[in-house]
Amino acid sequence: MIYLFILFALIAGMALPTQFSINAQLRSLVGSPILASTISFIVGSIALLILSLFQQGVRFNKGWLEGPWWIFTGGLLGAFYVVATIVLIPRIGAASTVAFILTGQIIASVLIDHFGLFGVQIQSINLYKFIGVSLIIIGVIFVQKH
């Protein structure tokens, strides 16, 4: 079963640079990274709304409003992420954009795990994680070399 999750993660990972490149072309068509991001989010939101309508047992609950304020900021971070990729792809290319984003994701993930931020179970930084992050950063440097 774990292999299916790994495959799912790999496919999701491959979807991101594809989305980035498609959104960069959309920006060229509409002339604005913000408008391209808006269109991308509207299309994605419609797809999610349709999926939500068919999901069993999930309904609006006013208890949702009792969570911490930051729990609803994921969409803002997603919007920043999409705009950033639309701006970066034409300037530094897909490989460099993904390499730098991946580096940022790994660094943030290790810090979130280490400090238990956002309710994540604490997983301290160890030598293996440090070496792994270092190798990713070295890989980004190699991706940048022409």
What is the meaning of each model-derived region?
Residues 107-127:
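C-terminal transmembrane-helix exit sites in multi-pass transporters
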